[in-house]
């Protein structure tokens, strides 16, 4: 949330392409969701001896309750629905594992994959172009895009292979979290399919934007504040908001801090 500037997203600079929320809305939402994420970790610990899929199924009622808490805290604004799903799963995966394993991001995300195996097929089994109702269902029916379900089922490759190494390489260069995190966000956006961008524009625009960002990052892997602010202005002009990539950035931060703490404990 506080990484700034984040093109098209709520941050300390502005509300991005969102007229119904600001950084304080996000703070209210995050505070309301803290008990949920703790409950997810506890659920993971309590079901650690059972099949991973059972932990995931046990999370779903908690997630529904958390969405209600979020909406109550924000006056009906959806700030963190994606994070309720993805961050909740990662917290439960951490709960299932011995603390000594937290230093290994790949192991944590392998547990995420085990928990959600078969999720995409199960949730989209009966989806067709005719009956697709949600944005996710429509994108799956038209393009075969699996969105966040596909990401978690695959062990969040956009986090493990893109976000985390980009963030940590930037920090190693001496950049602060604004610049290293901004670079990680753009790398995720360039290297994965952000369904929020498609929903606010088109598949063609999302693909073109990804290619544009790949070219930018080849030349400047960590754009400075002015460059990020210019991108922010462009995204707002087009009403673009990479919300899916923002959730993946949040997971990148979570795993960075968890794995760093785990390695420091050794």
Task: Please identify what each model-predicted range represents.
Residues 1-52, 56, 94-233, 256, ...:
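Phosphate-rich cofactor/ligand-interacting catalytic cores and adjacent structured alpha/beta frameworks
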Residues 56, 76-77, 81-84, 102-105, ...:
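Alpha-helix N-cap/helix-initiation sites
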Residues 83, 87, 113, 250-251:
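Hydrophobic faces of alpha-helical transmembrane segments in multi-pass integral membrane proteins
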Residues 237, 241-266:
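Short, amphipathic C-terminal "tail helix"
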Residues 39-95:
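Long, hydrophobic/aromatic-enriched structural stretches that serve as scaffold segments
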Residues 5, 13, 60, 73, ...:
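Generic detector of intrinsically disordered, low-complexity, polar/charged segments
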Residues 68-81, 173, 233-242:
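A short glycine/serine-rich beta->alpha loop
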